[in-house]
Regions:
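Active-site microenvironment for binding and transforming phosphate-containing groups
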Residues: 1-250
Length: 250
């Protein structure tokens, strides 16, 4: 099956893609392009899926970190620089290195300064976003020669507000950071709230002073044919879930 890849004009002409679950070799609950080695899927099948992504990106291998919901960023010049490192973002100014981020509701964020040949990729769930992983990625890119006013950031498929119910304690964490963050919460049912993760992500990107910030507009929870979703898996009491991959290279 052909791979289904979402791209964004803001990142052109760089090779990049927010890969959907279409076109992979996994089966069962992982059916499709599961790229998560942390899942209980067969390792050899996941490696085959990752090889298909690398081939689509025209690189021999993908650079990916051991994601832990942190704000830590790694500078990568070769895929081996990221292997096994606990972090949630990477930046690079070397050609033909594809940075790969795994998600299943969290925000995959791809960054580029095309003029100065610097790229970045971040895994930004609520905790990473709140703790500044996107801001940290921008700063690391600047350290590699990017200019803030040239950097574009694009948020890929993530869970949307209508599907992201949270409790009062969650709201409190965001209020503690900035009481203006209430604008990213809508009243839900039975004392719950609906959190706008992509809206908050766009806010943090724009506050970082970069050239532009966009979201592709895709909700992982509401489209099981295209996307894996951790929260949907929990609601369905499924055994496990796949991970989507988003990549960018110079």
């Amino acid at each position: 099956m052909t791979l289904n890849i979402i791209t964004h004009p803001s990142l052109a002409p760089l090779r990049h893609g927010f890969f959907t679950r279409k076109g992979g070799a996994s089966s069962g609950v992982f059916s499709g392009l599961n790229c998560g080695l942390g899942s209980s899927d067969q390792r050899e099948v996941v490696m085959l899926n990752r090889a298909r992504v690398a081939e689509a990106m025209n690189v021999p291998a993908l650079a990916s970190v051991y994601q832990v919901h942190s704000a830590d960023v790694v500078v990568v010049h070769d895929p081996s620089d990221a292997e096994g490192i606990k972090a949630d973002a990477m930046v690079c100014n070397a050609p033909d290195v594809a940075l790969g981020i795994l998600t299943a509701d969290c925000q995959p964020v791809l960054f580029a300064d095309v003029e100065n040949h610097v790229i970045g990729a971040a895994h930004a769930g609520w905790k990473g976003a709140l703790n500044g992983v996107m801001d940290a990625t921008v700063e690391k890119m600047i350290g590699l020669g990017a200019q803030r006013e040239n950097i574009v950031g694009v948020i890929g498929p993530s869970i949307s507000q209508k599907s992201y119910e949270v409790g009062a304690e969650f709201l409190g964490d965001f209020m503690y950071e900035d009481d203006q963050n209430t604008r990213f919460f809508a009243n839900g049912q039975k004392g719950k709230y609906q959190f706008d993760l992509p809206g908050y992500g766009l806010h943090r990107l724009r506050a970082a002073g970069i050239k532009s910030a966009e979201w592709t507009g895709h909700c992982t929870y509401s489209d099981p044919n295209l996307f894996y979703s951790y929260r949907r898996t929990c609601h369905e009491n499924a055994a496990d879930y796949g991970r989507l991959i988003s990549t960018i290279s110079l």
